[in-house]
Amino acid sequence: MAKLSKRQKLINEKVDSTKAYSIEEAVALLQELSKVKFSETVDAAINLGIDPRKSDQAVRGATSLPHGTGKDVRVAVFTQGANAEAAKEAGAEFVGMEDLAEQIKGGMMDFDVVIADPAAMRVVGMLGQVLGPRGLMPNPKTGTVTPDVVGAVKNAKAGQVRYRADKGGIIHGGIGKISFDANAIKENLEALISDLKKAKPASAKGIYVKRVSLSTTMGPGLTIDQSSLTA
Protein backbone atom coordinates (compact mmCIF):
# COMPACT_ATOMS: atom_id res chain seq x y z
CA MET A 1 0.00 0.00 0.00
CA ALA A 2 1.37 3.41 -0.99
CA LYS A 3 2.48 5.64 1.84
CA LEU A 4 0.30 8.72 2.27
CA SER A 5 1.93 12.15 2.21
CA LYS A 6 1.60 14.42 5.24
CA ARG A 7 -0.77 16.59 3.24
CA GLN A 8 -2.97 13.68 2.23
CA LYS A 9 -3.11 12.48 5.83
CA LEU A 10 -4.18 15.98 6.90
CA ILE A 11 -6.84 16.07 4.18
CA ASN A 12 -8.17 12.68 5.28
CA GLU A 13 -8.35 13.92 8.88
CA LYS A 14 -9.92 17.30 8.17
CA VAL A 15 -12.27 16.80 5.21
CA ASP A 16 -15.75 15.32 5.61
CA SER A 17 -16.79 14.21 2.11
CA THR A 18 -20.43 13.89 3.23
CA LYS A 19 -20.68 17.49 4.44
CA ALA A 20 -21.80 20.65 2.65
CA TYR A 21 -19.60 23.47 3.95
CA SER A 22 -20.55 27.12 4.25
CA ILE A 23 -18.41 29.26 1.97
CA GLU A 24 -16.57 30.68 5.00
CA GLU A 25 -15.83 27.19 6.38
CA ALA A 26 -14.69 25.96 2.98
CA VAL A 27 -12.25 28.83 2.38
CA ALA A 28 -10.82 28.53 5.91
CA LEU A 29 -10.30 24.78 5.45
CA LEU A 30 -8.74 25.13 1.99
CA GLN A 31 -6.38 27.78 3.38
CA GLU A 32 -5.44 25.49 6.28
CA LEU A 33 -4.72 22.63 3.88
CA SER A 34 -2.71 24.73 1.42
CA LYS A 35 0.89 23.82 2.23
CA VAL A 36 2.58 24.62 -1.08
CA LYS A 37 4.91 27.58 -1.58
CA PHE A 38 2.80 29.32 -4.22
CA SER A 39 -0.63 30.93 -3.98
CA GLU A 40 -2.91 28.22 -5.35
CA THR A 41 -5.87 29.04 -7.58
CA VAL A 42 -9.31 28.48 -6.08
CA ASP A 43 -11.38 26.59 -8.65
CA ALA A 44 -15.17 26.39 -8.71
CA ALA A 45 -17.04 23.43 -10.22
CA ILE A 46 -20.75 24.07 -10.73
CA ASN A 47 -23.00 21.20 -11.81
CA LEU A 48 -25.91 22.46 -13.90
CA GLY A 49 -29.22 20.75 -14.58
CA ILE A 50 -28.81 20.84 -18.36
CA ASP A 51 -28.43 18.32 -21.16
CA PRO A 52 -25.28 19.56 -22.92
CA ARG A 53 -25.99 17.21 -25.85
CA LYS A 54 -28.84 19.54 -26.84
CA SER A 55 -27.70 22.62 -28.73
CA ASP A 56 -30.36 24.78 -27.07
CA GLN A 57 -28.94 23.91 -23.64
CA ALA A 58 -25.36 24.99 -24.27
CA VAL A 59 -24.21 27.37 -21.54
CA ARG A 60 -21.26 29.66 -22.20
CA GLY A 61 -20.37 33.25 -21.47
CA ALA A 62 -18.14 35.51 -19.41
CA THR A 63 -18.26 37.00 -15.92
CA SER A 64 -16.34 39.97 -14.57
CA LEU A 65 -15.28 38.98 -11.06
CA PRO A 66 -15.52 41.88 -8.58
CA HIS A 67 -12.17 40.98 -7.01
CA GLY A 68 -10.45 39.66 -10.14
CA THR A 69 -8.71 36.31 -10.43
CA GLY A 70 -5.36 37.25 -8.93
CA LYS A 71 -3.75 36.15 -12.18
CA ASP A 72 -1.65 38.27 -14.54
CA VAL A 73 -3.61 37.82 -17.78
CA ARG A 74 -1.74 38.14 -21.08
CA VAL A 75 -3.86 39.24 -24.03
CA ALA A 76 -3.52 38.87 -27.81
CA VAL A 77 -5.68 41.10 -30.02
CA PHE A 78 -6.46 40.81 -33.71
CA THR A 79 -7.21 44.27 -35.05
CA GLN A 80 -5.55 47.05 -37.03
CA GLY A 81 -5.32 50.81 -37.45
CA ALA A 82 -6.38 53.07 -34.59
CA ASN A 83 -7.85 50.08 -32.75
CA ALA A 84 -4.42 48.44 -32.68
CA GLU A 85 -2.80 51.41 -30.97
CA ALA A 86 -5.68 51.70 -28.51
CA ALA A 87 -5.44 47.99 -27.66
CA LYS A 88 -1.72 48.36 -26.92
CA GLU A 89 -2.42 51.35 -24.69
CA ALA A 90 -5.08 49.31 -22.85
CA GLY A 91 -2.42 46.73 -21.99
CA ALA A 92 -2.58 44.06 -24.71
CA GLU A 93 0.73 42.19 -25.01
CA PHE A 94 0.30 41.15 -28.64
CA VAL A 95 -1.56 43.09 -31.35
CA GLY A 96 -1.66 42.42 -35.07
CA MET A 97 -3.35 40.70 -37.98
CA GLU A 98 -1.64 38.32 -40.44
CA ASP A 99 1.70 38.93 -38.71
CA LEU A 100 0.28 37.82 -35.35
CA ALA A 101 -1.40 34.81 -36.99
CA GLU A 102 1.96 33.73 -38.42
CA GLN A 103 3.58 33.98 -34.98
CA ILE A 104 0.86 31.75 -33.51
CA LYS A 105 1.18 29.25 -36.37
CA GLY A 106 4.88 29.16 -35.55
CA GLY A 107 4.17 28.09 -31.98
CA MET A 108 3.97 31.38 -30.06
CA MET A 109 1.28 30.79 -27.41
CA ASP A 110 2.38 33.20 -24.68
CA PHE A 111 -1.12 34.52 -23.96
CA ASP A 112 -4.23 33.59 -21.98
CA VAL A 113 -6.98 35.37 -23.95
CA VAL A 114 -7.52 36.12 -27.64
CA ILE A 115 -9.72 39.06 -28.67
CA ALA A 116 -10.71 40.03 -32.21
CA ASP A 117 -12.73 42.74 -33.87
CA PRO A 118 -15.34 41.31 -36.28
CA ALA A 119 -13.37 42.28 -39.39
CA ALA A 120 -10.35 40.33 -38.12
CA MET A 121 -12.19 37.02 -37.87
CA ARG A 122 -11.25 36.22 -41.48
CA VAL A 123 -7.67 35.94 -40.17
CA VAL A 124 -8.48 34.33 -36.83
CA GLY A 125 -10.66 31.73 -38.56
CA MET A 126 -7.54 30.17 -40.05
CA LEU A 127 -6.25 29.46 -36.52
CA GLY A 128 -9.21 27.33 -35.45
CA GLN A 129 -7.19 24.12 -35.17
CA VAL A 130 -4.63 25.87 -32.96
CA LEU A 131 -6.84 28.04 -30.76
CA GLY A 132 -9.98 25.87 -30.62
CA PRO A 133 -8.60 22.88 -28.67
CA ARG A 134 -7.09 25.28 -26.12
CA GLY A 135 -10.37 27.10 -25.55
CA LEU A 136 -8.89 30.32 -26.92
CA MET A 137 -11.00 30.86 -30.05
CA PRO A 138 -12.72 34.27 -29.85
CA ASN A 139 -16.51 34.12 -29.59
CA PRO A 140 -19.20 36.85 -29.45
CA LYS A 141 -20.90 35.06 -26.52
CA THR A 142 -17.84 35.55 -24.34
CA GLY A 143 -17.28 39.13 -25.46
CA THR A 144 -14.05 38.28 -27.26
CA VAL A 145 -15.35 39.09 -30.75
CA THR A 146 -16.32 42.74 -30.49
CA PRO A 147 -15.75 46.11 -32.15
CA ASP A 148 -14.88 47.42 -28.67
CA VAL A 149 -11.52 45.68 -28.39
CA VAL A 150 -10.31 48.21 -25.81
CA GLY A 151 -13.19 47.38 -23.47
CA ALA A 152 -12.56 43.67 -23.98
CA VAL A 153 -8.86 44.06 -23.15
CA LYS A 154 -9.70 45.99 -19.99
CA ASN A 155 -12.24 43.33 -18.94
CA ALA A 156 -9.72 40.54 -19.51
CA LYS A 157 -7.05 42.37 -17.54
CA ALA A 158 -9.49 43.09 -14.71
CA GLY A 159 -10.21 39.39 -14.18
CA GLN A 160 -13.01 38.36 -16.50
CA VAL A 161 -13.65 34.61 -16.44
CA ARG A 162 -14.93 32.84 -19.54
CA TYR A 163 -16.99 29.72 -18.92
CA ARG A 164 -18.48 26.88 -20.93
CA ALA A 165 -20.37 23.81 -19.72
CA ASP A 166 -18.47 20.60 -20.41
CA LYS A 167 -19.97 17.31 -21.64
CA GLY A 168 -21.14 16.55 -18.10
CA GLY A 169 -22.95 19.88 -17.75
CA ILE A 170 -20.28 21.20 -15.37
CA ILE A 171 -18.83 24.71 -15.38
CA HIS A 172 -15.20 24.98 -14.26
CA GLY A 173 -13.47 28.27 -13.50
CA GLY A 174 -10.78 29.87 -11.38
CA ILE A 175 -12.37 32.45 -9.05
CA GLY A 176 -9.32 33.76 -7.21
CA LYS A 177 -6.28 32.79 -5.20
CA ILE A 178 -6.14 31.00 -1.85
CA SER A 179 -4.50 34.16 -0.48
CA PHE A 180 -7.80 36.06 -1.02
CA ASP A 181 -9.98 36.54 2.05
CA ALA A 182 -13.19 34.52 2.32
CA ASN A 183 -15.43 37.46 1.43
CA ALA A 184 -13.60 38.14 -1.85
CA ILE A 185 -13.89 34.48 -2.89
CA LYS A 186 -17.55 34.44 -1.82
CA GLU A 187 -18.39 37.54 -3.87
CA ASN A 188 -16.50 36.22 -6.91
CA LEU A 189 -18.37 32.90 -6.69
CA GLU A 190 -21.71 34.68 -6.28
CA ALA A 191 -21.00 36.83 -9.35
CA LEU A 192 -20.30 33.70 -11.41
CA ILE A 193 -23.42 31.87 -10.19
CA SER A 194 -25.57 34.97 -10.74
CA ASP A 195 -24.46 35.18 -14.38
CA LEU A 196 -24.97 31.43 -14.85
CA LYS A 197 -28.55 31.79 -13.63
CA LYS A 198 -29.12 34.60 -16.14
CA ALA A 199 -27.80 32.26 -18.85
CA LYS A 200 -30.19 29.43 -17.92
CA PRO A 201 -31.55 27.84 -21.11
CA ALA A 202 -35.34 28.18 -21.43
CA SER A 203 -35.60 24.45 -22.11
CA ALA A 204 -33.70 23.40 -18.95
CA LYS A 205 -36.03 21.67 -16.47
CA GLY A 206 -35.78 20.94 -12.75
CA ILE A 207 -33.05 22.18 -10.42
CA TYR A 208 -30.60 24.33 -12.40
CA VAL A 209 -27.66 24.83 -10.02
CA LYS A 210 -27.42 21.29 -8.66
CA ARG A 211 -24.06 21.33 -6.89
CA VAL A 212 -21.28 23.81 -6.16
CA SER A 213 -17.83 22.78 -5.03
CA LEU A 214 -14.51 24.53 -4.44
CA SER A 215 -11.00 23.16 -4.63
CA THR A 216 -7.45 24.43 -4.92
CA THR A 217 -4.82 23.50 -7.48
CA MET A 218 -3.39 20.78 -5.24
CA GLY A 219 -6.19 20.37 -2.71
CA PRO A 220 -9.44 18.48 -2.13
CA GLY A 221 -12.88 19.40 -3.46
CA LEU A 222 -15.39 20.68 -0.90
CA THR A 223 -19.15 20.77 -1.51
CA ILE A 224 -20.61 24.21 -0.76
CA ASP A 225 -23.86 24.75 1.11
CA GLN A 226 -25.70 26.99 -1.35
CA SER A 227 -27.71 28.59 1.46
CA SER A 228 -24.46 30.33 2.52
CA LEU A 229 -24.47 32.19 -0.82
CA THR A 230 -26.68 35.11 -1.83
CA ALA A 231 -26.53 34.55 -5.61
Swiss-Prot record:
One Pfam family cited in the UniProt record for this chain: Ribosomal_L1
GO cellular component, one term: cytosolic large ribosomal subunit
InterPro entries according to UniProt: Ribosom_uL1_bac-type (IPR005878), Ribosomal_uL1 (IPR002143), Ribosomal_uL1-like (IPR023674), Ribosomal_uL1/biogenesis (IPR028364), Ribosomal_uL1_3-a/b-sand (IPR016095), Ribosomal_uL1_CS (IPR023673)
Gene3D superfamilies attached to this UniProt entry: 3.30.190.20, 3.40.50.790
Record's signal peptide: none
Quaternary structure note: Part of the 50S ribosomal subunit.
Function: Binds directly to 23S rRNA. The L1 stalk is quite mobile in the ribosome, and is involved in E site tRNA release.
Protein name stated in the entry: Large ribosomal subunit protein uL1
